[in-house]
């Protein structure tokens, strides 16, 4: 079959392990979703900063794509204690 070609109407993308996510009930490669996006609101995992991910509740780390022409990154949950501590300290200072 075609990678990322499956439907995600009733179940999530099976191809998430190869970097695919659901958009408009069809699975697409994450970088394709990001490249074709008009705004960050086009997909819940699109971001331009770590704060975007935290605000959306979809992670705490915005990872850019290697292709510099793609203006949006992809949200992930970073489990590093150092990362979480750094953010906590930053928020403590600014609030």
Swiss-Prot record:
Q: How is it modified after translation?
A: Contains 3 disulfide bonds. This is a cyclic peptide.
- Give the matching PROSITE patterns: CYCLOTIDE (PS51052), CYCLOTIDE_BRACELET (PS60008)
Q: Where is this cross-link: Cyclopeptide (Gly-Asn)?
A: 1-30
Propeptide at 31-95
Tissue specificity statement from the Swiss-Prot or TrEMBL entry = Expressed in stem, shoot, root, leaf, pod and nodule but not in flower and seed (at protein level).
Q: Which domain of life is it from?
A: Eukaryota
Quote the Pfam families the UniProt record gives. Albumin_I_a, Cyclotide
Q: What is known of its domains?
A: The presence of a 'disulfide through disulfide knot' structurally defines this protein as a knottin.
Name this protein carries in UniProt: Cliotide T5
This chain's source organism reads: Clitoria ternatea (Butterfly pea)
């Amino acid at each position: 079959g075609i990678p990322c070609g499956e439907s995600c109407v009733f179940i999530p993308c099976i191809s998430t392990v190869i970097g695919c996510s659901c958009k408009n009930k069809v699975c697409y490669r994450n970088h394709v979703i990001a490249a074709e996006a008009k705004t960050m609101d086009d997909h819940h995992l699109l971001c331009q900063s770590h704060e975007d991910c935290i605000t959306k509740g979809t992670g705490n780390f915005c990872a850019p794509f290697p292709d510099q022409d793609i203006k949006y990154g992809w949200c992930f949950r970073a489990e590093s204690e150092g990362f979480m501590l750094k953010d906590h300290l930053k928020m403590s200072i600014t609030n």
